[in-house]
Amino acid sequence: MPSSDTSRPCKRCKTENAPFSLRQDPTCGDCYVQYVAGKMNKRLGALHKDIRVSRLPTHRRYLAGLSFGPSSSVLAQLLDETAYRHSIKKSSSPFEPIIVHVDTDLSSQGGESPARKLLDEYRQRFPHATFECVPLTDVLSVKSIDWSTLPLDAGTPDEDPAARLRRLFDALPTVTSRADILRQLVRHLLLHMALERPCSALLLGHSTTALAALTLSEVANGRGFAVPLSVADGMTTVCKYETTPDGAVQETSRLEFPVYYPLREIFRNEMLQYIDLMPSLKEVVPSNEADATANVVSHKDMSIEEVMARYFQSVEDGYSGIVANVVRTTGKLDRSQGNSFCGSCGMSLDAEGDSRWAGEIGDDSGHGSGSGGLGRLCYGCKRSIHG
């Protein structure tokens, strides 16, 4: 953010009249930009070190999610810049970022969607990355979800897939449930695309602030056991399911795939300041996304995830250390991998923990589909899907 005292020199390069404040230090615009880019490059370097299997230069193809929000837009711009730097260095290994936006609009409007039009602007401004827009309906072909655990009807071959997903969301009990399941479906679809390409890793553009909000919303939703798996960098288990001839669903395979958050060490307000310093980003990031915290609304019709996001966005200026500590503490927790995984969110099942969460609700039989398939769901997904 702009500093109240512009007469002090930049803490990093000693340039006079540093107009910005970065981690309480006076900073010039160039150093501000370098700081944000350096944080992402550091995380990408750690990722490459974690997953490389040879000392020889290897092709790095990363798939990154794009929501059109500030953080994911900054990630797209920085990946485009990194791809350009690698392209002009003959000795550098190929670097190929694939930026994917999942269009969650399930309306039946014809013509080109607003998301595709906006993505065209991203393509023009960031030509060194590949941009794709995929409809949320593509998730219906994803095998990493046990669809028998969700209230999704069988449908007919010629039925509109969007209509089936609309009925699924209409069957969910609360706003929080719909936001929770939507986030899961988007994550499953991005993982599916990253595996199909194939890519080296899936990159998600969460800031420190967003990860803190995700941490507490996951705990509030009943997935405290799996928070280290869903928030920390590292390998995630992807299970594949198939329906047998007799109608039962069984797991057919599982593999490990890296999911990383390259912007995890940058606060949301720092992203917004970075966007103001980058004309290519300022022109393309929707202003309503950048000013999302300006509107004060009732929490009555908001999901837990939205409430947590607004809370951390409102306190990060005065209590940035607390926000960062939430994320750092989560990163230090053990990533305990279980033998069983939730058929909906894909996180490890903790039988004892689920029992403690459930309290007097009682045990489920764990057989059948729909409400009868509760045994394949973690406690958080049981509550999201069935109330």
List the model feature ranges, each with a label.
Residues M1, C10, S303-G387:
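Cys/His-clustered metal-coordination modules, chiefly Zn-binding fingers
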Residues P2-R23, D30, L211, I266-A324, ...:
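Mid-to-C-terminal catalytic subdomains of enzymes
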Residues S3-G234, S384:
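ATP-dependent adenylation/nucleotidyltransferase module used to activate substrates
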Residues R55, P161-D180, T244-E256, G366-L374:
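Intrinsically disordered, low-complexity acidic Ser/Thr-rich regulatory segments
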Residues S67, S71, L182, L263, ...:
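Catalytic cores of large soluble enzymes that bind and process phosphate-bearing ligands
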Residues S92-P97, S253-P258, D301-I304, S369-L377:
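Glycine-rich, flexible loop segments associated with nucleotide phosphate handling
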Residues A210-A213, S217-E305:
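Catalytic subdomain that performs nucleotidyl-dependent activation
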